[in-house]
Design a protein with these regions (language model features):
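NAD(P)+-binding Rossmann beta1-loop-alpha1 motif at the extreme N-terminus of oxidoreductases
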Residues: 1-55
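NAD(P)-dependent Rossmann-like dehydrogenase/reductase catalytic/cofactor-binding core
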Residues: 2, 217-319
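A structural signal for isolated positions on well-ordered beta-strands in alpha/beta enzyme cores
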Residues: 7, 29-31, 97, 119, ...
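Short, well-ordered alpha-helices that flank and scaffold nucleotide-derived cofactor binding pockets
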Residues: 20-24, 84-88, 111, 272, ...
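Glycine-rich beta-alpha junction loops
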Residues: 37, 101-103, 122-127, 150, ...
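Rossmann-like NAD(P)(H) cofactor-binding subdomain of soluble oxidoreductases
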Residues: 51-135
Length: 319
């Protein structure tokens, strides 16, 4: 199996890492899937990554049809609206890798195109947007981790992806424990993203505050209880996958970046999913319930819901 046509859906923080790496391959077709005004903007402006403009092809979903590999790099909230595009891209032999956060995007995609197309995967990259585009440190980036959900783990498509990435500066590795790896990253996201987003401080807060560490640990305990109930043994991968990318103490992860920019977050994918799973399994999730409602309230604040200015304010009472 050779991968010669690669389509990337989503050219944001995660997609930028993929585009940066695969643009070095001159022996493949590389395109970003986009149409309408967004597609025109990408054709005109390209993708600004680490101070350089990259110009992959821009394909409509129909033009990208039957790509050998489709890499999905969307925000969680955008996935339901993108399923028609994913179906249009997917041909009989298309492999799909979802580099989205969380642990259920593969299930959502599989419901639209069939689970046989999915090669389970994740990415660890500390990417952020500045005025001149997206930035990340290639050297400290952990990169892309992928593997088959079921044996054989050294399948032809795993070997094909290894060969594709091997000719680039992308950091990557294949694993026999992809579900445990995904839950390990999910744990990092929940425990590191959410408390700092509520506080509005850099990640150094976990090192410097016993209170922030206590909140992070509470979220961790709930997640690990749910994972154990689902038969996910994250101890299998703790030695190789228990840490994220090295960052400065001032670093702000994706949830706080979203709030800083006035965007809605992926809290439904993080605590929202854990609350749902906890209810299904009979496992209490008070830390995640608090984080969920606090971040939802911060979204409402960004939306202007609590803008109590003006002369004609209706009186209210605490209750």
């Amino acid at each position: 199996m050779d991968i010669k046509k690669v389509a990337v859906l989503g050219a944001g923080a995660v997609g930028s890492y993929v585009i940066w790496g695969l643009s070095a391959r001159r022996d493949i077709e590389l395109g970003v899937v986009a149409d309408g005004p967004r597609g025109e903007r990408l054709k005109k402006d390209g993708c600004a990554i680490n101070g350089k403009i990259y110009r992959p092809a821009v394909w409509t979903p129909q033009e990208a049809h039957d790509a050998d590999l489709l890499i999905v790099c969307l925000k969680y909230g955008a996935l339901p609206g993108a399923l028609d595009s994913i179906k249009a891209v997917t041909g009989p032999h298309t492999t799909i890798m979802s580099l989205m956060n969380g642990v259920d995007s593969e299930d959502i995609i599989a419901s639209a195109v069939g689970g046989e197309h999915l090669l389970y995967s994740l990415i660890k990259v500390a990417s952020h947007k500045e005025a001149d585009g997206f930035h990340f440190d290639p050297e400290t980036t952990v990169g892309i981790i992928f593997g088959e959900k079921e044996p054989p783990c050294d399948s032809p498509r795993v070997k094909a992806v290894e060969a594709l990435f091997g000719g680039t500066e992308l950091h990557f590795r294949a694993t026999d424990c992809i579900q445990e790896e995904m839950w390990s990253k999910f744990r990092l996201n929940v425990c590191n993203n959410l408390p700092q987003a509520i506080l509005g401080a850099g990640v150094g807060c976990y090192r410097d505050s016993v209170h922030m560490k206590a909140i992070s640990d509470g979220l961790r305990r709930e997640l690990e209880a749910i994972a154990a109930a689902k038969g996910i043994d994250m101890q299998k991968v703790d030695a190789v996958s228990g840490k994220g990318c090295a960052v400065k103490p001032s670093a702000r992860y994706s949830t706080l970046q979203d709030l800083d920019a006035g965007r809605h977050t992926e809290i439904d994918m993080f605590s929202g999913a854990l609350i749902r799973m906890g209810k299904e399994l009979g496992i209490p999730t008070p830390y995640n319930e608090f984080a969920y409602h606090m971040i939802k309230a911060l979204e409402e604040k960004n939306d202007g819901k609590f803008d109590y200015t003006g002369p004609n304010q209706e009186m209210t009472w605490a209750r």
